[in-house]
Every structure is written in structure tokens, then in C-alpha cells.
From Swiss-Prot:
Subcellular location: Cytoplasm
Top-rank taxon, per record: Bacteria
InterPro entries: 4pyrrol_synth_GluAld_NH2Trfase, Aminotrans_3, Aminotrans_3_PPA_site, PyrdxlP-dep_Trfase, PyrdxlP-dep_Trfase_major, PyrdxlP-dep_Trfase_small
A GO term for molecular function: transaminase activity
Pathway: Porphyrin-containing compound metabolism; protoporphyrin-IX biosynthesis; 5-aminolevulinate from L-glutamyl-tRNA(Glu): step 2/2
Keywords: Cytoplasm, Isomerase, Porphyrin biosynthesis, Pyridoxal phosphate
Organism, scientific name: Hydrogenobaculum sp. (strain Y04AAS1)
Gene Ontology biological process: protoporphyrinogen IX biosynthetic process
UniProt-recorded name of the protein: Glutamate-1-semialdehyde 2,1-aminomutase
Amino acid sequence: MTNKEAFELAKKYMPGGVSSPVRAFKSVGAEPIVVNRGFGAFVEDIEGKKYIDYMLSFGPLILGHRSEIVVSKIMEALDKGNSFGITNMYEIELSELIIKASKVIDKVRFVSSGTEAVMSAIRLARGITNKPYIIKFDGCYHGFSDSVLVGAGSGVATLGIPGTPGIPKEFAALTIVLDYNDENALEEAFIKYKNQIAAVLVEPVAGNMGVVLPKESWLKKLRDITKENDALLIFDEVITGFRLALGGAAEYFGIEPDIVCYGKIIGGGMPIGAYGAKNHIMERVAPEGPIYQAGTLSGNPISVASGLAILKTLIKDIAIYDRLSELRAYLTYTLSKMLSEKGIPHRINEIASMFTIFFTDKDVIDFKSAKTSDTALFGKFFRNALKEGVLMPPSQFEAWFLSTAHTKDVVDTTLEKLKKAIDLL
């Protein structure tokens, strides 16, 4: 069966043929591939074509596809049972590792997705402060729950819609959307909504409008202004947690949030999410406190065992972060040089082992500047690269990721293929 035939079949049974909109490749004008398997830095489609993968399932596969360490741990857990609805030892071990690595939380609660982690963190913030409003930032994506699918990036930006039908205006009215990196707007919001703001929710490095780096003065401002106004600072580290550093963005930038949300890497490609905070906050979560949150599959042994294997590897070999950062810098420097030689305006925003190429001549510091990108040109670049065997995220507004399986040889091969893709632009 060809990719085209399989996708036509998928469309018969699933909306748009996908389980998540960006997978339809609509914004890049490409025929979607249907994956058969992944191995190391590669995926292979059902036609047998191999691609060097820089999506990595949108971030969780920091050790690459089908890592022996991860697969072995999953099989060990699976041999004991796939779900219990009761606390298991893998869950306890993973929670201990997350807490020790983060250095900013005392307790953690597992859920089944990043969306659930953020939903729970918002409820916790509102329950503690008894205030209604949440501040988020234009272009930051925090999952698809009603409270935060306002001014979102990622798939919503790709579809070109501001939110989605089905969310009552009353929900949106309690979410204040500001520009990323704008200190003045932040100050004005706290004046206008004095004593009504429960929390500021932020991706400390935006990854869902493409990679957008925070001004460090702005991050510090977030911390200071929330403390001054008895509001909580929530870091959505679903992408950046264990990606920027062992302690995530909190460690990388030296800013301590009140609540941290995790996902992706802590499950190694299995469904998972988590949120954590200091004891005085987490003691308000049921069953210790009155703020309710629950889930049948939360902390399921397969997901937490997978995450446990990854975190143990990262803790044992902390130099992984430096190696990945150096490899990313080599890739992006050479890629930028190729684009410049071709006379193509671009900006590459990069940090640790993640980056985004924006086809624009403007510095990208927020969603407005990200949207100056030539998305049609990106689409052509994507299609050219796909033909050459390089799989990048199928949206201008997503991050590329590297894994430990991306060796120097793999990156050199990538650059050879991308040179051909660029020459055809």
C-alpha cells in the first residue's frame, strides 16, 4: 500500500485522516506520509522510504527512536502488567527523580498528557488564590483545554484560526492574552486586573510558535510581578523540561516558578504529563487538600517506566546536553550559511537541542514577528526536504529537535540533503 492509499483509508475512519491536525501536512501542501517504524534518528514510511527525523514525535524522543534502554524498561514493566489504577514502584521512582532533578518542586502529580497538566495547574492556582483570571501569551500553546486555547500557536496558528468553535465566550473572558516578551503590557494587565489575577502561565522558551527565546529581563519581571501581586507563576515545561537542561528552563535561566508542568521527555514517547510545586502548594491537591484532580491512567506503569529509563540516562550522562547543543549549533550554523548563500532571508532561533528556521528578515521575538515568516516558502522547503529524506515538523510554527541518535555523520548527511532542498527554492 502507498502512503497516499493508506491516508485515503485513514480519512475514511478519522477526521482528516489524523489524530492531531498538524499531521495532515495541510499548511505545507504535502502528501502526508504514513509511518511504519522508527529507529535511532530515522523513521521509515510504509513504502520503505527512510527519513532523518527532526520531529522526534514533537520532542519527547531525546534518546531517539526505539532506544534499547527505553524499550527494555518498557518490556520489563509490561511483563508485570500494563495498568493497575493503583500506585506502582515505577511511579514512585520517577517522581523522586523529577523532584531531585528540578530542584524547584517538592511533590509531583502524574496525569496522562501535557494538556491535563496545564488544566490541573490552572485549577490549582485559582483554588489557592481564589482569583479568576489567568495571563497567557499570544502564540504560546498549552494544550487544547477551553481556558487556554485562546491566542494559541502551533496547530491553531497553522490552521489560521484564533481559537475554536465550541468554547463559550465566558471561558475566553477569563484568559488575558499578552504579547510574549512585552514587559509594559504585563505591568498594565496587573494594574487593570488588580487583585484578580490567579497566575501567569508561560512557556519559558516558546516552542509552539516556533522557538522564541525569552528576554531574561522579561522572565525576571514575570517572577517579580507575580510575587508582588500574590499571583502564581506557572512554567509550562512540557517541551523544555529535561530538554534545555536536567532542571529544564528553571535551571537554565535561574528563575524559580511556583508550579511546573511537564510532559514529553518524562514519558519518552508514551502518554504522560505531570505538574509539581512546593509542599505548601501541593498539599492543597486531593486527597491531601480540597482541590480535585484525578485520572484512571495517571501514572500508568508503562509510561512512567519509559520516562524512568530516560531520566536515569540523562542523570548518568549529564554531558549529553552539551553534546546535543554543540551538534545543534553546527547544524544551524551550516544551514544558515547555505540559506544566506542562496540569498534567502531567514532567522534561526535556537537553544539547547531545539531550533526553528523562520523565513523572514525580522528578528522573531513574539508571535507577531513569527507570523511575518513566508509560510509558502517554508512549505516548499518542507516538500523538497521530504523528497530528499529529511523529515522536519510540518509547520512553520513548530520546533526541530535533535536526539542522542543524531550523530555528526547523520547531521552531515542531513546538510547534504538540505543543500539540495535549498537549491530548488
